Amino acid sequence: EPYRRQRQMCIRDRALIDTIRVELRQRYSFGYDYVAVAPGNYGLDFMKESYGYDLDMSVKCSNFIGETIDMAADMGFKRMLLTGHIGKLIKVAGGIMNTHSREADCRIELLTAFAFKCGVAPEYIKCIMDSLTTEEALAALKESGRLYEVMDYAMERICFYLDKRAKGRLEIDCIMYSNEFGELAKSRKAEKWFTLLAQEQAQPI
């Protein structure tokens, strides 16, 4: 029974990865050398309100961030924008490229470590470590007065691991947000994407 469940999961995962590959290939065939990627439509309203960007236009990578980077690079894409909720993207800050909870889930541990690194007071460190959700941990960070300092450091780590996976084959930018606090952090060149994407949305492929 455990073997059968594992095999079914592998089949489902492979089907999802094949779907991502088809979407990427279709986009590349239209002549685009850049692609916007998101784990899903979580944050759809935030992206529309903040940037005027419709997440429905992006390729949905589900939990397979690493596989998506590999496929995009192999196809010849030069640039990628990854947008996502902290619940998914904070895992990338620990080098986790498959963000499904059955693979790894150290969201709170990573946030606690980053808070400690940024000098957050011990009483807040304990609150963060005791949090049940990333939103709860963010509330403790906000109260500590170091939320955005910690988020900027988290984004540094996310970009480090994205670049490590890409191996210089494509440039990756990232925006991370939460339901309650909106935009948490973004990479240096992420803002420049939205002029490009707005032009594309005016003439959808």
PLM features per residue range, with description:
Residues 171-202:
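Short, amphipathic C-terminal "tail helix"
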Residues 1-7, 11:
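Single conserved hydrophobic/aromatic residue that forms the stacking wall/gate
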Residues 12-152, 157-160, 165-169, 175-179:
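A structural signal for small-residue-enriched, beta-sheet-centric alpha/beta enzyme cores
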Residues 7, 149-153, 190-191, 198:
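Charged, low-complexity, helix-prone segments enriched in Lys/Glu/Asp/Gln
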